[in-house]
Regions:
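A short alpha->loop->secondary-structure connector
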Residues: 91-100
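N-terminal, charged low-complexity regulatory/assembly segments
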Residues: 69-78, 87
Length: 310
């Protein structure tokens, strides 16, 4: 690692499993992480009553799954209740409070995800019925506004499609690092992945300051101040610029291969009415979908916080 790279790297806590220059802690962390990781979708699911009023047992069950997989799927009795306090109150219970006022969000910073063709949303794929490739949310945000927590709450599913594939970023990290620590080093470079400037996004991701969003370079993998692994990624091929060197190219190819290949830790889920995903911004996709009489509606809440307690 060059001196310049070190200037851009976070100060890692002693004994961090993510310290490539002092890897002693990594093998034990890797073994424990893989041993704890669920291998079936059923192990992510928690049945609950009202998400706005979790019992202590429901809270503990969700937290346990998030500790093992950085995510949980709740199956609630809320049905098609359109109350936006459902994701808001649920998030607060897990320490998710600092909402990201992104460009497409509603006034309360919770986004109503459905097919929209107005000028504000036109051209942005989340508001279409098209498939969305692997990504973490808010990958275009600046370093001070990274998305660490995410809730997706389903009010109405599509008539067909709209499924999500899910993968814990820590599992993706392990599978790439197994192929060589230098690949991880490339993915942790501060200029590994750049999202080019977008003059259409005034103020972009944090509520709008009246300025076009500039280039946003940053790493794919980084370590947050609390010592947790953080991932920033999109599998799209347009509107993205990778660092131009052979090691980065090899690292990106390895990561894309990990995302393409089936594995015991990759899950496929379809959120039904009253169901939701609460997570530490895990990797996810969305299949194409077709609406019926009532359009698909999900609420998306993005947070600058991680889930508290894990």
């Amino acid at each position: 690692m060059t001196h310049q790279d070190r200037l851009h790297s976070p100060a890692l806590p002693d004994g961090s499993p993510f310290d490539l220059d002092n890897p002693a802690a990594y093998p034990a962390w890797r073994e424990a992480r893989l041993a704890a990781a669920p291998r079936t979708l059923d192990h992510l699911i928690v049945e609950i009553g009202d998400p706005r009023h979790l019992t202590e047992a429901e809270h503990a069950a969700i937290l346990k799954r998030c500790a093992r997989a950085n995510m949980a799927i709740y199956v609630s009795t809320a049905g098609e209740d359109p109350d936006k306090s459902i994701p808001a109150r649920l998030g607060e219970r897990f320490g998710l409070c600092r909402l990201d006022h992104n460009r497409g969000a509603d006034e309360d910073a919770i986004t109503s995800l459905m097919v929209k063709d107005d000028a504000r949303h036109r051209g942005y794929i989340p508001y279409t019925d098209r498939p969305i490739a692997w990504h973490t949310d808010g990958y275009y945000n600046d370093a001070e506004h990274q998305i660490h927590g995410l809730i997706l709450h389903c009010v109405r599913p599509a008539e067909q499609g709209g499924d999500n594939a899910l993968l814990d970023p820590e599992i993706a990290y392990i599978r790439v690092r197994d192929q060589g620590p230098d690949l991880i080093r490339a993915l942790m470079h501060p200029e590994c992945m750049t999202i080019p400037a977008n003059p259409r996004e005034l103020g972009g991701d944090q509520g709008g300051q009246g300025h076009p969003r500039p280039d946003r370079p940053g790493p794919v993998f980084s370590v947050a101040q609390d010592g947790h692994l953080h991932m920033r990624y999109t599998d799209r091929s347009r509107s993205i610029r990778w660092r131009d060197d052979p090691l980065t190219a090899a690292a990106v190819a390895c990561l894309k291969s990990v995302l393409r290949e089936p594995s015991p830790w990759r899950f496929q889920a379809r959120l039904e009415s009253g169901w939701g995903l609460i997570c530490n911004n895990v990797l996810h996709t969305r299949t194409a979908f077709a609406d019926g009489t009532a359009p698909r509606l999900l609420y998306r809440a993005r947070y600058y916080d991680r889930i508290r307690g894990i």
